């Protein structure tokens, strides 16, 4: 599993905004690209990082752990 700096910065932005849309905007990425990157991270890890809700997202336990590691980078 390999994530680049763009992936990690995007994940932090999404987690802090609690929104893929706003995280994508903060990262200067198209929504479709940001969503695909997050889904790719989840697929590579084999666990969901986000719980997608009607209005935004919430971090799963795995997402909380990933956020700690992503902030270090």
Name these PLM-found stretches:
Residues 7-14, 66:
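Short alpha-helical "packing" element that flanks the helix-turn-helix/winged-helix DNA-binding module
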Residues 42-59, 64:
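A short LG(V/I)-centered, amphipathic sequence patch enriched
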Residues 17, 26, 39-48:
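Residue cluster at the C-terminal edge of the helix-turn-helix DNA-binding motif
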Residues 1:
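C-terminal effector-binding regulatory domain of bacterial HTH transcription factors
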Residues 12-31:
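Short helix-boundary/capping micro-motifs
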Residues 4-7, 31, 63, 70:
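The N-cap/first-turn positions of alpha helices
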């Amino acid at each position: 599993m390999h994530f680049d700096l763009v992936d990690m910065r995007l994940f932090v932005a999404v987690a802090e905004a609690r929104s893929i849309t706003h995280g994508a905007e903060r990262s200067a990425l198209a929504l479709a690209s940001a969503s695909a990157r997050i889904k790719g991270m989840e697929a590579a890890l084999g666990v969901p990082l986000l719980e997608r809700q009607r209005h935004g997202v919430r971090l799963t336990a795995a997402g909380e752990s990933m956020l700690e590691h992503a902030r270090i980078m």
